[in-house]
Amino acid sequence: MATENKNLSEYDKNTIPNAKDFRFGIVVSEWNDVITEGLYNGAFEALIDCDVPAQQIIRWNVPGSFELIYGAKKMLQTQNVDAVIVIGCVIQGETKHFDFVCEGVTQGIKDLNVQTDIPVIFCVLTDNNMQQSIDRSGGVHGNKGTEAAIAAIKMAYIRQQASISHPFNQPLLSSGALQIEETPIKIEKE
């Protein structure tokens, strides 16, 4: 188990970029709200601890984890955010519904990351039982929401740094190759 030997709430503030000027969106599923509220609290507290002003954190609720995709998409389109964290919890039941929801949410959030220029951080627990979710939302393994907030700060910083123009940056062709503008070289003879 990936979190068995790791506390999700631990981070070294000295390794995290300055986040005071970033603006974050958090989209929270209301399904399994005991868990998602714990995850939200972990994310919110970590952002505040990393100097993000509370007024620069926008929260939207959606009914369930599947709706996180649409909520995140609309937040990306309408809010001026540097990153979005999606928070949900899907717990294995007796049917295949768990598999469909987990796959759909995972692919939907992946698609948003591919299609947009703003990072969307995946904080959706997909556990076998309620105890595993409790353990990862402020329990014995810490809080996945905290980990997601730190990831959001780091990704917002990467986005910011990547947008800074450098003289060696060249536009890419649709094939992924560098587009290099040819400039004729004039050789003057004396």
Curated annotation (Swiss-Prot):
Sorted UniProt keywords: Riboflavin biosynthesis, Transferase
Q: In which pathway does it act?
A: Cofactor biosynthesis; riboflavin biosynthesis; riboflavin from 2-hydroxy-3-oxobutyl phosphate and 5-amino-6-(D-ribitylamino)uracil: step 1/2
Enzyme class, top EC level, equals: transferase
- The reaction(s) this protein catalyses: (2S)-2-hydroxy-3-oxobutyl phosphate + 5-amino-6-(D-ribitylamino)uracil = 6,7-dimethyl-8-(1-D-ribityl)lumazine + phosphate + 2 H2O + H(+)
What the entry lists under SUPFAM superfamilies is as follows: Lumazine synthase
Q: What EC identifiers does the entry list?
A: 2.5.1.78
Biological processes, Gene Ontology terms: riboflavin biosynthetic process
Tell me one GO molecular function of this protein.
6,7-dimethyl-8-ribityllumazine synthase activity
Catalytic residues (positions): H97 (proton donor)
An annotated GO cellular component of this protein is: riboflavin synthase complex
Q: Where is (2S)-2-hydroxy-3-oxobutyl phosphate annotated to bind?
A: E94, T95, R136
Q: What does this protein do?
A: Catalyzes the formation of 6,7-dimethyl-8-ribityllumazine by condensation of 5-amino-6-(D-ribitylamino)uracil with 3,4-dihydroxy-2-butanone 4-phosphate. This is the penultimate step in the biosynthesis of riboflavin.
Q: Which family does it belong to?
A: Belongs to the DMRL synthase family.
Q: What is this protein called?
A: 6,7-dimethyl-8-ribityllumazine synthase
